[in-house]
From Swiss-Prot:
Homology family: Belongs to the RimM family.
Organism for this UniProt entry: Buchnera aphidicola subsp. Cinara cedri (strain Cc)
GO molecular function: ribosome binding
One GO CC term on file: ribosome
Protein name: Ribosome maturation factor RimM
Summary of subunit composition and partner proteins: Binds ribosomal protein uS19.
Length: 169
């Protein structure tokens, strides 16, 4: 299962929710039904979402038969999951972000640096948050400057540390 978004807190008193999309184009989340809500195992189909609208950097959604704030409690604060096969097949050397979470980071000398804990999108480029010796380091996801090689099958990402101002010391 892949996390493609999150249902947040209730919005107002009429059964609306905040919903955050993690897809590259925010609206694409509505192309991948059914959704499974992680904690409650509730399945939501396209016809369950009776209305949605953009609200700042996320969406407000209205789910069928949820008409007040109390009824929202079974839905809130849950990741939205889909099955891997629901995503389009990719070409060679393409990958989804969730594919790199299982990769280990190595430097150019083949020394293991750590594993990816998060991907941060700062609007200009993404940054990998890596756990290294119980501390977090941040690597810009810029190819080929910092990211030299990605091998999803071997679960390896090779990075160049020479431009990172010794943040590993």
């Amino acid at each position: 299962m892949i996390t493609i978004g999150k249902i947040g807190k209730p919005y107002g008193i009429l059964g609306w929710f905040h919903m955050f999309s993690y897809t590259e184009k925010k609206n694409n989340i509505f192309n991948y039904f059914p959704w499974k809500l992680e904690k409650s195992n509730i399945l939501l189909y396209k016809n369950n979402i009776i209305h949605y609208k953009t609200h700042t950097d996320h969406f407000l959604i209205k789910i069928k038969d949820i008409n007040n704030r109390t009824q929202t409690l079974n839905f809130i604060k849950q990741n939205i999951l889909i099955k891997n096969f629901q995503l389009p097949k990719l070409k060679n050397k393409e990958y989804y972000w969730n594919d790199i979470f299982s990769c280990y980071i190595f430097d150019l000398k083949k020394k293991k640096i750590g594993s990816i804990k998060n991907i941060i999108d700062n609007k200009f480029y993404c940054t990998l948050e890596i756990l290294y010796k119980k501390k977090k380091i941040y690597i810009p996801f810029i190819q080929p400057n910092f990211i030299k090689k990605i091998d999803i099958k071997k679960k390896i990402i090779v990075i160049d540390l020479t431009n990172l101002n010794n943040q590993l010391i």
